[in-house]
């Protein structure tokens, strides 16, 4: 079996999205899980103007656009069993659209509590439950839950929540991620540095909390990995990386597999630079965890993850001209979608003929929007380098 590092090194750009009337940072990418003959494969992209664009994957042309106006959308996720696309909104709702229909209004609206500002969310693997995380308001930072299923007895498009967890985070809930195959397991990350694992099949919040891990810094990304997805990894806004093994919760073995306060200081990039982390990539077939990072000039780095540390394996270049914000790896055809601050969505495929195009420079975006996108912290890194 070809290793993912070989697949990654063999990627070439086959398509670049066309320019849009309003260039934006591309902050999140997800692809439709339903593939049908005769139907185009859909890609949903979260944009820094608070909207979601739907693209045809092969041509990368914009098919339609959904807005959360007057709120801003945070996160983007396709359902697992249909072409519904979801996003959390700062107006206190989670919205759901039919990605194949150009309709402004959501087909479903999941309402939170009056003061909720949702900044993270996910839907579980059987499409039954949605969980969204809020900004801290007063002393509350919540995880709010809904039943996502359509009810033939109640055709209302608006749904109230099932309830909320309120005791386990003390600051903004920046990340929510359900287990890939267990619909009852969910992990949340927060600006308070805590990463909490819950079994939502258990009635009350205190008993549902399986374990708490501490990254000691604001959480920017979390995910599941390992055989049976019994490990979790975490990245922080100051480029830290943490990896925990839940198999060891009831043993004498340490739960922490890896603890790196600042990846930029420890990974040997040889002649290159590593400016930030983008996300993690667990390859189920090879049981390997990889970390994706990049440079401010658009180069993308693949790093192998083991208990001895992170190792730079290979890099992609010649695509983006600025910070890369998002990626989506397709296991079926080993293709990669990337997006970033140059407003370009790129499709990479293995062994393809390289497409040439003119690079776009990074854009300046409004400060109000900039507050809602991930800002990589260089301050602590620069301070330590001076010491």
Swiss-Prot record:
Renumbered ranges of WD repeats: 21-65, 68-107, 112-156, 168-208, 214-254, 319-358
UniProt GO BP: corpus callosum development; ventricular system development
Keywords: Repeat, WD repeat
InterPro entries assigned: WD40/YVTN_repeat-like_dom_sf (IPR015943), WD40_repeat_dom_sf (IPR036322), WD40_rpt (IPR001680), WDR89 (IPR039328)
Domain of life: Eukaryota
Keyword Oxidoreductase: no
Pfam family membership, one: WD40
Alphabetical list of Gene3D superfamilies matching this protein: YVTN repeat-like/Quinoprotein amine dehydrogenase
Metal-binding listed as a keyword: no
PANTHER family tied to this protein: WD REPEAT-CONTAINING PROTEIN 89
Protein name per its UniProtKB record: WD repeat-containing protein 89
Gene designation per UniProt: WDR89
